[in-house]
Amino acid sequence: KEKKLNLSENFKTFVDKIKVKNEEEENEAKVGNSIVTTLDLELQQVASDALGDNKGSVVAINPKTGEILAMVSKPSFDPNDLGAALEAAYSGSDEETPLINRAIDGLYPPGSVFKTVTLSSALENIPGVANRTFNDQGKIIFDDGTTLNNYAYQSHGAIDLRYAYRVSSNVVFGTLAMELGNSTLKQTAENYGFNSVISGPGLTITASQ
C-alpha cells in the first residue's frame, strides 16, 4: 500500500510538472505583426488636452484619404489595467462608461450645427426670407407648449437672417423650422445625407436616427 501511494504521488508530481511546462510554453511572448496607424501623436495629444475632463470625443480625419489623424474618447481607461475596467463595466459600478468609444458608438443630437440645414431649407422654400426682420425676445414657445430659450437667455431684438445665423438665434431658427414644417425640413436634411449611411475610406458613419 505504501509503494502504491508513493507511485501515485510521483505520477501526480510528474503530470503537474508537464502541465506547468506546457503553460509556460503557451505564455511565452511571441513576435507578432507590426501595426502602423495613421494617428498623429502630436495632434492626438492636442485633442486629448482640449477635451480635458469633459465627456465626449474628438476626431480628426484627412478628407482626401480617410486617414484617422486623431481619435479621442473620454472618459477613458488605463489600457494596462483593462481587467479592472471590464469588471467595473460588467458590475455596473462605473457610471462613466469609459469602455464606450464615443467617437463611433455615441448617439448625439446635432445641436446648433443643424441651423445650417434649416437656413438652407428656408432660403430654398420660404420666399423673401433673406429680407425679413425677426423679433427675437429670447425664447420661443412651440405648438406643444415646449419653450426654447436662446443661449444664456439672451434677447437680440429686431434682427435679420444674417445676424440671426451669426449669433445662433434659437428663436429665429425655431420660428423658421415651424414655418417649414417637418416634411420639408426632413427632405432638406436628407438631401444633405441625413438618414443615410456615409461610407468611405477610414471611418464609416451610420445612418442618423
For each feature predicted by the language model, list its residue ranges.
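Extracytoplasmic/periplasmic proteins that interact with beta-lactams or build/remodel peptidoglycan
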Residues: K1-S57, V72, F77-R102, L107
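Beta-lactam-recognizing serine transpeptidase/beta-lactamase-like catalytic domain environment
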Residues: N22-E24, K64-S112, V117-Q209
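Short hydrophobic alpha-helical segments used for membrane anchoring or interfacial signaling
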Residues: V58-P63
